[in-house]
């Protein structure tokens, strides 16, 4: 019985303390971003003022988000690699988009701009200014279209 009470008390302690580790969002200075993220901002968003930069610390993960005054947003991994770029009122800088994806969009949607790009371990997703979503595998082959 004593053992059961100890297990229950330990479980209750873990459950009540878990929220303290999850979702710890806090603003940070741009200088606190990983060096890779700072270099990315200087290379692709030079001259655009940062409105907000923040870190989101989860129990086993951390990521960063930067919002610019022009409405653009960039999310970075814990290592400072970009994972999501959204340019609400403009176009994603061309140098961010892999050449094969730019070529595909230019050929098949010549009057469209890429307004967002997202990448992960499995694929790239881009959104065009008409709301059309295109998904590419890591070899840049189109694998899905989302209207």
Predicted regions mapped to residue ranges:
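Positively charged n-region of N-terminal signal peptides that target proteins for export
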Residues: 1-4
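Interaction-mediating elements
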Residues: 23-147
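Hydrophobic helical h-region of N-terminal Sec-dependent signal peptides
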Residues: 6-13
């Amino acid at each position: 019985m004593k053992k059961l009470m100890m297990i229950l008390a330990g479980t209750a302690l873990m459950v009540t303390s878990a929220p303290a580790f999850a979702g710890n969002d806090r603003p940070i200075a741009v200088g606190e971003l990983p060096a890779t993220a700072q270099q990315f901002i200087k290379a692709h968003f030079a001259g655009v003022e940062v409105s907000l930069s923040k870190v989101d610390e989860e129990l086993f993960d951390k990521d960063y988000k930067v919002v610019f005054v022009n409405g653009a947003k960039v999310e970075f991994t814990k290592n400072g690699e970009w994972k999501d770029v959204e340019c609400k009122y403009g176009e994603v800088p061309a140098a961010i988009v892999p050449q094969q994806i730019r070529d595909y969009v230019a050929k098949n949607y010549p009057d469209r701009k890429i307004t967002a790009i997202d990448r992960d371990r499995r694929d790239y997703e881009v959104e065009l200014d008409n709301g059309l979503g295109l998904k590419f595998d890591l070899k840049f082959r189109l694998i899905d279209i989302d209207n």
